[in-house]
Amino acid sequence: MQSGPVVRAMMLLAGAMALIPLMDTAAKSLSTDYDLAPASIGFGRFAAQFIFVFLGIALSRSILGRRIQPGRPRPTLIPARPLIHLVRGALHGGGSMIFFVAVKYMPLADTIAVFFIEPMLLLALSAVFLGDHVGWPRRIASVIGFCGALLVVQPSYQLFGAVALLPLLAALMFATYLLITRRYGAGEHPVTMQLWSATGGMVTIGVCIVVGELVGALDYRLTVPNLGEEIALLALMGIVSTAAHITIVIAYQLAPASILAPFSYLEIVSATIFGYLVFDEFPGGLQWVGISIVVATGLFIFLRERMLELRPTPIGDARAAPTTDLDG
């Protein structure tokens, strides 16, 4: 039986969460091993995304693109609400840049641990501004998932100083970015949205670099990558981020933010894997317990929403409420 939109959205978001830590790993390597400023890394990441998406739009609107996908909707260069999507891109760019600054000084897993306040913020924002119903099962799943993430990374109290405020600020900006995606994404082509997200990100980070050069802020200065490994890593970041965030846009077009929020915790599983492969950090026993909790939380929400989608509509109730607005 074909999956409904909510289940498809959860599967898409789970896939995106598996990709994003690869970009974070590349960003940390560029700032620590190659001495690129985090702001310049962020600008390069969004510049690469802009190039890839622009070329994709040009190809899709060419004769070749129409032959490959006949009858499919084509992405456009200008969305229906350009200003809204510029603001969305500014939030995305600013949040990414701040996160890259934090990950330069903090361990990758610990930075992500602090950032994981984002699903909590998203649940609250979606309930207040979008009117999403947040039932107790979703609330409990989010809390349990956050506790599992803390077990994975084992953050110390020393992290909650001035530097720890950076991933918290990034989490707030990214939660707002996702909220706007949910509110204004309907009817927009995901590829077009990513083009304008990249544009807004480049403008925002570009302004920060200019200010950073004027005031001498090292993390916000302009550093030019070489044509070897540094450019390759930035290109990888652009490809991964484009694929992941197009997937995120589609997911949030299909399902409410309050349902998808717990699945953000799956990112910590992928981050743990990349931490082992790249930095030789192998999880201990307590971390494996946390990973199991995170996976179990996502599976619980997945199976529950699947059951709600398959539940038959009562006879005579032609206007029954959608399953995504039930008791959690």
Model regions: which residues?
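Transmembrane alpha-helical segments that form core, pore/gating elements
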Residues: 21, 28, 38, 53, ...
